Structures are given as C-alpha cells and as structure tokens.
C-alpha cells in the first residue's frame, strides 16, 4: 500500500503543480504561501488543470497533456507527476511528424522531408512556419513526392493573413501541387483570411510535390504564422521503429498492483507483435497487441488474458492481486479475469513502447499511464480515472459515433455501420443497392450491366466496380466490354500492364472521345457523346495479358444515399438538453427535401437548393437557413454552428430545452429522401464542446476506420 511518505509527496507535488498553473495565469506566488491561500485564486485556473484523483498506492504517473515537441526536444524526459523520481527517458524520438507530441502530418524541422527557405521564412518549428516577408518565390517545398496512392492532406491554422491581405502586403497564401518534372502547378489552393485551412490533393492523379507560397511583393511589414493542427493533441506517439521510454530508477512491482493506460493503438502489419509497455514480461507486467482486435495483459511468463479493443482511444486497467489477474476496459466496463503463477522478484527499469524483455516497438499514441503499487483498485477508483480523462480530453469521448471508412460494397456486414464507442447502437442500412449511386462510394458504372465480349482477351472476375482482362493478345485493339451511352465518366486504376501493351478507354470510334493508356496508373476521363456511341474498354497486346481494372469512385470513403429509397437509421437513444454533433457529411444535390440528418425533438438538417435548413426543436419550432453550403462541421444545442472553414455562426433565438429519445435518420425523413454522402459522425450528449474541442473532435474522427 502507499506509505504516508508517498501521500505527503503527492500533496507537495500537487501544491507545486497548482503554484505553476497560477504563475502561468499571471499570479506572483512565493513558495512560502500557505496552501489554503491558493483557494482564493484557484477558480481562475483553466478547468482542465491536472488534478488526478487520489487513488491509493500511486507510485508513478505520466500525462502528456500540455507537452510540446520544442519542450521535449530540449529535455526528452517524461516527468513522473508523483515526484517519486520514476521519470521516463525518451529515446530516439524525432519530436516532429508522427514521432513525438501531438502527431503532425509534416515535420518541418526535417531537412530530409522539407526544404525551408530561411530568407523568406523567419523561423519554423516542427509544425509552425512564421513569415515576415512575402515573396514571388516558393518559401517551403516538400522533398517527398506524392501521388494518388500517397495523397498529401493537412489541416492548418493561419494567423495574420487577413490583416496582411487587407493592407495590401500579401495577395494570398497558396499551397500548390507541383509537377516534379516541369515545375508547373497542377492544382492550387489559395487563401486570403485567417482560420482553419484544410488541404487535400486527392484528385491529383500524377506525381507531385507540395509548395507553400506566401505570394506578395517583397514587403517586410507582415507577421503571418501557418501552424499545423495535431491529429492527437495530448498524446506522445511512438513510431513503431525505435522510439521508446525507460526509467533510470528501478520500478519494482509488488504482487498486488493496478496499471491504468490511455492509448490509441496503430497497426499496419497484423503479424507483427507490438509491446506497449512493461517491465519484465516473464516476471511481472507487460501489455502488447498484434492486431487491432484485442490487447494482452501478461502477468508473468505464459500467464496472460486478452481484452477487446474499441475503435480509437482505449483506456484499460490491468490488475493483479496475488495469483488473480483481470483487465478492464473502462470505456465499455467489460472485465476479463484469469489466474497467474506465483510472484517473482523483478528489480529493474520500466518501459513504454517496449519492455525489458523484447524490443518489439509499439506504434501507438499514449496519453498517460498511472501505476499503483500494492493496491487493487475498486470500481469507484476506475470511474474516477475515467471521469478525469473525460475532462482532460472531452473530444475523445462521444456518446455515439460512426465511421464508414474502410467499408466496401462487398462486405458481408455492409448493411451495418458499427458504433465506434462499442455501445452496440449501430447504424442499419435499408434498400441500398450497393452499386453505382447507392452504397459505399459513388460509382459511375456497374460493370455487371456491361456487355462482356468473349475475344482473345476478355473480361473475367467481373464485379460491380472491377474486372480482370486475361488472354493472349493478337496485336490489335480488342473490345473487352462495352455499353451504349451518351457519356463517359471514368476514374480507373489499371495494374498489370506490360511494356508494349495499350488500353483504350472511352469511344474508340471517334478521335478525341477516348484516352490511350500504356502503363499502370490512375486515369480520369469525362466526355459527352452522341446518344448511340459505344462506351467501353479495348485492349491491345501481342503477349499474355492479366490486367486488373478498378473503378475509383467519387466520394471514396463515404456512404452515398440515392435519394430514392435509401435509409440509414440508428436505434433509439437519449439526447438531453446540451449536446454537440461533429462530423463529415455532405448533401450532393441541390433540391428542396425535408430530409437529411434528423433526430426528432432535437435537430433537423434539411437539404435545400440554396444550402441547408437547420431546425432545432430547442428553438420552439423556429429554424433558419445557412446559404451556399452543403455541409456543416459541427452544430451545438446552444445555437452555435460551424461551417466548413470553421467560421462560427449563431442562432440567437431563445432556447427552450427538451429531451429526445428516438432514432436518428440519415438520408431520409418520413417519406422524403435526399442524396447525401456520409463519412462519420460523433454525438456528445450533455456536452457543449468549445470551438477548439469541436475541431479536435472532427480531426480525431477523420483518423478512425470502421475496421
């Protein structure tokens, strides 16, 4: 059990934490001030001040909240919050990109990845660029080459841009996909105002590098900052290659202990074992996983139990009391129990992202860990820990959440979208065709409806969205499949072509109505034809052929409703007076339909030819229009709405609170239907998230997959 000395040290360190927080708020706090005097100033502290619950036996505690890459690069030590000296020495971290604090798309400190022109860029960190001079040349350029298989995406925040543009010092911030051979711009995003910037070159099919270009006339009277937003704020990310942390001081476990760990596991190779943390796995304690299905708690050699992951954030308590062990998922309240062998002495250091036994580095984001020695925690303790994390990271705890990323029209469970939280309230799909404009992705064609030709090269393994071409060519253009159409809308990926082969896509009977392909790649072709044209694919080869042709849909990674009879609905759930909804969805037609995203007695988001009609039951029956937009990033029950650029608009009609207990409907309402694309959604009950937390919630949802 924790000693009196341990408790006194926790009190002393808590006092110092509060003192430092007050100093950061502008107070002059001498070290001699009585502890009780802090109460007069404590209300001015931010609500997320680190006040971890006082649980028996805490000997070491780590929290990544508030850390920065700059701070950790200067002193790579993860301080033990208890003051007991079990500080973690962090080894091999880059302190930028996806190795370090926060998780950023780019590491602007890496000269291998980025060329930063220091003449124009006054200063930069791993995730921030500061400009004091506009230019007619590129200020920052990626050394990495991107393409359709490796798309450049980022979420940024610009400050100082609006002022500089208004006074004529700067024309715009441009972010450009540039051809690496010709140096010509392929696609350009241009921004003239402060705020959140979202970049995705997902429609650029060829190779490109990325330029950041603050365009102006060499003026020096500006101060503009471009900052990447982290994907995992409040976490430290290990890269799964060689990043790890270790104590210098021995942390010796007793035969009774509890370890709380908050983390997000990553995995791209299910055959590879990943050690999340531990001491000597043959003696005392270790956690590991090899897939995103479950985590193993190992309490000595060959004694282990497994617990299921949830999607994204996981919060587990691993407990031992003599020969009894259990692992509890605090998010789902599910407990797995087991037994283990006799206690083995275990003097030695403690590790994160590996253990003392194996150097199998975990690719994981860790928010924090708490180790209680000599204590088997109670359910009440567990609830306190869960509540603490909810207050520290509110955006990570939706009450309802769904994503369709990773689902396909061929999945056995394609008509169900699992709830990310693990609460079982899955979305159920009805009447979907799972082809063309009804299902996962918006496909131009259903290849099963084409006329298939049985020639020397011919189609096989034909699916709705793909087929293979096989055979031995006769050195002429051979029609593989076709349909009669007045238009072509092809975005396809071709793999398996050999040198000397050729593929014609479109209307081969008329010059200019087709494209000719001679190598593997992704190709786009759109053309209007005469009504009787033959739209198809021809293949030319003099050798054996085995080529795969796949359609790439519009709205890839989205569920698309057809606006005819497609329905998506949840089971009934309660939404109280205060709530926040965050998500990625879009109406894809301009029409006036009383359908879209609805939950009776809480909210109704209807499609309109001018934009979106928002009707909240809280507003006593009064709705309002949001023009020139087809999607919203977030909506709050206090009247706040956030547009795609995170501009805030507000409905100031007096609120009349109510509670709803019905289902949520997507793409329809009553007997009205509308076309929309749905990617993800998170619903936070009893929470009015701030704008910053809405942004964090949105960014977090974009990182999740359905499986």
Where do the model's predicted regions map?
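Extracytoplasmic low-complexity segments
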Residues: 3-9, 13, 43-135, 179-181, ...
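Short, low-complexity N-terminal tether/leader segments at secretion or assembly junctions of large
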Residues: 1-47
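Secreted extracellular polysaccharide-interacting domains
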Residues: 139-145, 237-250, 283-285, 300-305, ...
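Extracellular glycan-interaction patches encoded by glycine-rich segments
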Residues: 298, 337-376, 656-679
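Glycan-recognition/cleft segments
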Residues: 272-296, 587, 592-618
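Localized edge beta-strand/strand-to-loop motifs within extracellular or lumenal beta-rich domains
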Residues: 169, 179, 309-326, 627-644
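Solvent-exposed strand-to-loop "edge" motifs in beta-rich extracellular domains
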Residues: 64-65, 166, 252, 261-268, ...
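Short, aromatic/His-centered strand-loop micro-motif at the edge of beta-sheets
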Residues: 294-318, 338, 510-517, 611-633
